[in-house]
């Protein structure tokens, strides 16, 4: 059974991402693991150890109850029974990124569904610091859900290739499962240089075998000159009516990769577009 990690900080943005995680879990027949990374309780440093432990235990109890209540609320508003979507809740008393990496390993997570901004209410912040850190460190694919996104499945998916190759990535099987579940049309968008041409993405000489099943699905191949990336990507997404963009960063720093090739303007313009990040295999 597939397992989906759904971090939450109890913000509106985090709640929206957990809602999508539950909907995906039903469609993919997956289990959801709801996780909250709990900060240390606000106890003065000079307080006795017994007081700290007492406050800590109470905060842990309250957080666990709140997390369970949120999970049950999601079932209620989606009109689901617990038997339809299995889930568990975890409260991990460590910093966010460390907590998520621990759970990814211990719970054999296949996909992380996370909000783009979390508790940050600054409108100019498109992707919050916790999300960015996990995008950089996660060994499994991340589905980044923007604020106030209304999830309605993925009928058209754009897969952005920054080079003339289909690289090996963690999560290609997850992409294939999503495409199969939603009967999606895949639209490969290849950034090209120096007039490079290809009729179909399957013709690329550099492609990993894990893409074979994906390429059997209905797909289109589109070329975009590197110099025209911002406006061309906007036109492509509009023309294909894409509801998901798949990114496979080449650089070590995913932030640098996302905002290379003049794509920062485009990603900012499409901030409401869910992003599926396929990381390098570790």
Could you describe each region identified by the protein language model?
Residues 127-130, 202-206, 259-264:
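Charged helix-capping and loop-helix junction motifs
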Residues 1-54, 79, 156-222, 239-244, ...:
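Small/aliphatic-rich secondary-structure junction motif
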Residues 102-147:
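Hydrophobic alpha-helical segments and helix pairs
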Residues 73-112, 213-245, 250-265, 269, ...:
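Structural beta-alpha unit
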Residues 53-66:
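A short acidic, glycine-rich active-site loop
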Residues 13, 120-121, 166, 253-255:
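Short glycine-rich, flexible loops that bind phosphorylated cofactors or substrates
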Residues 37, 117, 147-149, 191, ...:
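Short, ordered loop/turn segments at secondary-structure junctions
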Residues 132, 176, 209, 234, ...:
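Active-site phosphate/pyrophosphate- and oxyanion-stabilizing loops and adjacent acidic/basic residues
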